[in-house]
């Protein structure tokens, strides 16, 4: 089935891009006109006259005058204590952003309510993986590398945020499962679109994890135990002193902490072996402690100061051969200050400012004298000196000290008549000082990479408009990018030397999203709406991509950012009280993405090579979502994603022909769900839930698809989960038991690596 349209020409039409940019500028310029309109409307309002065309269709409502400003302040995205480091993060959402209601937003966004999952044993990756257009693939169990794929784009092109602030380490790998689901209010999934208010680069989309705050003095915690000796615990405690009830002033102090542990000793297989083995030497643990204090209504609506300590330790295991000694560890310290104020100086202007600093020290130690060629212990090579296990002859003891400064800001101006103008930005500084301890002793060449630092600033301006009682919604925006990267030649001996030590670039992007509600509350049709969007976006190259690692990757100072033009269109229908069904939601979305200057590195080359801007790709596909409330007790859900990504041009130097299917990207997958729930079953305010979840992923290729007869494919799979949950005392005490992959189906992930089979987990959660 072919999904591609001949839109290459469209992308290259200067008139099309120019028209889009003009529309964005005109939309933002309309702010002044709307402000004048607001002033005139205020005078006419006293005479009870209709002076605005929107008023003809507006419903009469009674609202607090300060509501727009307060909502705008709550919506600003970078609040909360968030520590960023190279190996792990945790966020305490001191102020949560206003919920994004997908039905009243023109943006391409899916919002998942995590509060319904807080009593379950599920993880953030599991929950996100159930959304259409999203695939999260892991190379193992807890603590393993995660690759997030949104509509065919993955890794560095997909950004992970916590409370609106980027937290991944820039290489596309991030262990989202370290964050307990109990700390999450909701998960916002932006597909083929990176909102200007987030002030970050990226092209494939954004996963914004919004944390929640305890509403009052309370303690909440959870503990879960599962297969492979997996333990998870979390604790949140908060105490509030009301210092001036008349002015609503208060001081709150609290602590947030979590702990994760797993042996990851599951059975697995890979294309490199013809037998099933029990995985060992793959233990992982991490913990995080975050105390904070906040001041409410002391000029700022909220001022929060927090500090954090985070640690991780992981045994390293390979999928191709046995490893028995190599390991990695990291420790980080951080501090964060955030300030929030509604109606700052003028009514309707809200601000959220934040500053965070983190210091992280990490190490990868591989100094074994033994190398195993396979998983048995018979085919082995031993040496008198350190030989290394990760790669034969590549012994190393690398330590890195990283420093990160992040300063996001967000200003919203909410006009009386409804437009919201948002100016957001994020400054980020990163430095890295890598050391190779074996090279320092003269035992080998330095393989730790080059020290250096980087500065980046991303700023966005967006205008949100709602017309005719939200029958028409529009969000338009522009975004500016700047980054500079510096590498230092420390004089250490390396295989590869720097050919340049500085890189700088700047660019801009823009977007336009429109939603039109064609039917609103007509008989059994609650609403029917259509929408469309376009964004021109880019991704910065990383420091390693530009300067190399001194070993296997050469310097490439002229590397350009990746760019993409993303087109989306969709329709959604909500119905109620139809025969045999209580509610029905149907949604269809189409997407088409044209990517150019794709950054590529040939990891199969026998000699060191640089990253370079290779052929672009084009991705097309569609999604179908359906949700049904059969009655007040039974609900069903289903979604399907179909997508194809192909090379747009030939790159004969690396054997890539035009029209080849991009490898290692699923092309067809579906999710199914069924739930039975009932309240007041045994006691008043109790709740019982029984659920079934399933996923089907079709076969796809893990190398460039040259022929349908090639056998380098990842087999199709169908997995099923079962769970039961029971809570009492209005959810103050809950218990959950879940069986994942209860049919014990062998499931393969990226590059043919098998995932853990059947697994059990049980969890207890309490609130005091």
Model-inferred region functions:
Residues 216, 224, 240-326:
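Periplasmic-side early beta-strands and strand-to-turn transitions of outer-membrane beta-barrels
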């Amino acid at each position: 089935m072919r999904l591609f349209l001949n839109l290459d020409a469209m992308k290259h039409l200067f008139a099309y891009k120019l028209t889009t940019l003009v529309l964005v500028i005109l939309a933002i310029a309309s702010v002044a006109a709307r402000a004048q309109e607001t002033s005139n409307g205020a005078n006419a309002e006293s005479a009870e006259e209709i002076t605005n065309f929107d008023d003809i269709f507006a419903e009469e409502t009674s609202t607090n005058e300060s509501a727009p400003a307060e909502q705008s302040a709550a919506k600003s995205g970078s609040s909360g204590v968030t520590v960023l480091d190279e190996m792990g993060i945790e966020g305490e959402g001191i102020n949560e952003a206003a919920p994004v209601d997908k039905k009243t937003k023109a943006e391409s966004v899916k919002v998942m309510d995590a509060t319904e999952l807080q009593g379950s044993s599920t993880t953030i990756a599991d929950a996100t993986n159930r959304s259409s257009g999203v695939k999260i693939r892991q190379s193992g169990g807890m603590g393993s590398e995660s690759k997030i794929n949104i509509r065919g784009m993955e890794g560095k092109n997909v950004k992970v945020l916590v409370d609106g602030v980027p937290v991944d380490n820039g290489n596309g790998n991030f262990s989202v499962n370290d964050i307990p689901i109990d700390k999450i209010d909701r998960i916002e999934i932006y597909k083929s679109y990176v909102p200007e208010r987030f002030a970050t680069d990226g092209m494939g989309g954004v996963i914004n994890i919004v944390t929640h705050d305890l509403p009052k003095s309370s303690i909440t915690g959870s503990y879960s135990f599962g297969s492979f000796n997996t333990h998870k615990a979390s604790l949140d405690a908060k105490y509030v002193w009301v210092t001036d009830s008349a002015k609503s002033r208060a001081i709150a102090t609290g602590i947030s902490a979590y702990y994760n542990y797993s042996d990851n000793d599951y059975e697995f297989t890979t294309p490199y072996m013809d037998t099933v083995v029990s995985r060992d030497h793959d233990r992982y643990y991490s913990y995080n402690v975050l105390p904070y204090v906040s001041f409410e209504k002391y000029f700022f609506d909220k001022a929060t100061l927090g500090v954090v300590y985070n640690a991780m330790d992981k045994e390293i295991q390979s999928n191709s051969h046995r490893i028995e000694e190599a390991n990695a560890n990291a420790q980080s310290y951080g501090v964060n200050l955030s300030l929030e104020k509604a109606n700052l100086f003028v009514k309707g202007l809200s601000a959220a400012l934040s500053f965070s600093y983190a210091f992280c020290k990490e190490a990868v130690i591989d100094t074994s004298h033994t190398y195993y060629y396979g998983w048995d212990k018979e085919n082995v090579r031993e040496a008198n000196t350190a030989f290394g296990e990760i790669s034969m002859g590549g012994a190393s003891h690398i330590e890195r000290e990283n420093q990160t400064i992040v300063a996001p800001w967000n200003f919203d101006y909410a006009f009386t008549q409804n437009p919201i103008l948002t100016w957001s930005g994020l400054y980020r500084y990163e430095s890295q000082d890598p050391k190779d301890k074996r090279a320092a002793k003269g035992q080998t060449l330095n393989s730790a990479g080059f020290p250096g630092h980087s500065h980046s600033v991303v700023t966005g301006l967006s205008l949100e408009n709602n017309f005719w009682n939200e029958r028409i919604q529009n969000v338009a925006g522009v975004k500016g990018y700047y980054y500079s990267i510096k590498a230092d030649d420390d004089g250490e001996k390396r295989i590869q030397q720097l050919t340049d030590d500085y890189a700088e670039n700047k660019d801009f992007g823009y977007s336009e999203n429109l939603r039109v509600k064609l039917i609103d509350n007509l008989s059994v049709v609650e609403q029917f709406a259509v929408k469309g969007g376009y964004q021109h976006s880019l991704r910065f190259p990383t420091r390693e991509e530009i300067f190399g690692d001194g070993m296997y990757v050469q310097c490439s100072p002229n590397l350009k950012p990746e760019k993409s033009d993303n087109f989306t269109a969709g329709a959604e229908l909500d119905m109620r009280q139809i025969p045999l069904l209580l509610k029905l939601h149907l949604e269809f979305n189409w997407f088409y993405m044209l990517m150019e200057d794709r950054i590529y590195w040939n990891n199969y080359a026998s000699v060191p090579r640089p990253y370079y801007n290779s052929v672009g790709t084009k991705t097309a596909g569609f999604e179908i979502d359906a949700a049904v409330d059969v009655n007040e007790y039974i609900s069903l859900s289903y979604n399907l994603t179909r997508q194809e990504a192909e090379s747009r041009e030939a790159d004969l130097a690396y054997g890539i022909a035009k029209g080849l299917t991009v490898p290692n990207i699923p092309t067809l997958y579906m999710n199914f769900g069924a739930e039975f729930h009932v309240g007041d079953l045994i006691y008043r305010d109790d709740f019982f839930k029984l659920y079934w979840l399933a996923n089907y992923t079709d076969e796809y290729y893990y190398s460039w698809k040259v022929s349908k007869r090639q056998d380098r494919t990842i087999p199709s799979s169908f997995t099923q989960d079962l769970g039961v949950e029971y809570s009492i005392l209005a959810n103050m005490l809950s218990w959950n038991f879940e069986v994942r992959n209860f049919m014990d189906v062998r499931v393969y992930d990226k590059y043919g690596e098998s995932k853990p089979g059947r697994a059990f987990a049980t969890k207890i959660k309490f609130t005091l």
